[in-house]
Amino acid sequence: MYKRPRFNRVLLKLSGEVLMGPGQFGIDPATVARVADEIRAAREAGYQLCIVVGGGNIFRGLAATARGIERSSADYMGMLATVMNAIAVQNALENLGVDTRVQSAIPMPTVCEPFIRRRAERHMEKGRVVIFAAGTGNPFFTTDSGAALRAAEMKCDALFKGTSVDGVYDADPKKVKEARRYDCVSFNRVLADDLKVMDASATALCRDNNIPIVVFNIREQGNFSRVLKGDGVSTIVCNEEE
């Protein structure tokens, strides 16, 4: 049976959709402020935090490819969207007094720092929140893969994926009323059953580096801090299974 360890350094993966709140597109300032307050509370509780943000609220590379934009170009456009989201989250955190740095995998020195692993580690050791933008910096990789990569590089204890559902289910809970939520599920089952936690390459990277993935509902007020302490509703994806 899986025994959950004490997490100290964690990476929070936020989808772009979380940042658009009740809207259908773009950034909702009230939602970003609420998410920032969740992050502030976790930081004040003593956790070292880094964040990866998606860009789907602004631009979706795969959807654009289907409409005729060349795949690499579409992916780069999506990476730039994540930088916009990262700056929005940084602004919201700094409004709350949280010292924050944005590092981009695509260098843009007038906007933010380039990604430098050792510098990012020093920021976190000094109590700063680090937001990683532009995914891996390469086309054909999702921001989920970018999150898994950064979690491994930063030696994070876990990757927390904030979504609009409270965990991983054996079927789509929006379509199947009897769908069962897992408290704990193995990486291999997620991959074999295609449970859609993250894309396969991100899941495999976390498995190979023994980084648990914690899936939880970021839209519920105060839930991030509860799940960090082991009190909230979530699913843990790990190398063991209940």
UniProtKB/Swiss-Prot annotation:
Name the keywords, alphabetized. ATP-binding, Cytoplasm, Kinase, Nucleotide-binding, Pyrimidine biosynthesis, Transferase
**Activity control summary:** Inhibited by UTP.
Its main subcellular localisation, reduced to a broad class, is cytoplasm
Could you provide one GO biological process annotation from this protein's UniProt record? UDP biosynthetic process
> Which EC class, in a word?
transferase
Give the catalytic activity.
UMP + ATP = UDP + ADP
Give the pathway annotation.
Pyrimidine metabolism; CTP biosynthesis via de novo pathway; UDP from UMP (UMPK route): step 1/1
Q: Which GO terms describe its cellular component?
A: cytoplasm
- EC code(s) of this entry: 2.7.4.22
Q: Where does UMP bind?
A: 55, 75, 136-143
Q: Name one GO molecular function term.
A: ATP binding
Read off the Pfam families from this record. Answer: AA_kinase
The portions of this protein that span the membrane are none
Entry keyword NAD: no
Can you tell me which residues bind ATP?
Answer: 13-16, 56, 60, 163, 169, 172
Subcellular location as annotated: Cytoplasm
Q: Entry's NCBIfam families? A: pyrH_bact (TIGR02075)
Give the UniProt family note.
Belongs to the UMP kinase family.
Q: What functional role does this protein have?
A: Catalyzes the reversible phosphorylation of UMP to UDP.
Q: How does it assemble?
A: Homohexamer.
| Descriptive protein name | Uridylate kinase
Source organism:
Zymomonas mobilis subsp. mobilis (strain ATCC 31821 / ZM4 / CP4)
Q: Identify the coding gene.
A: pyrH
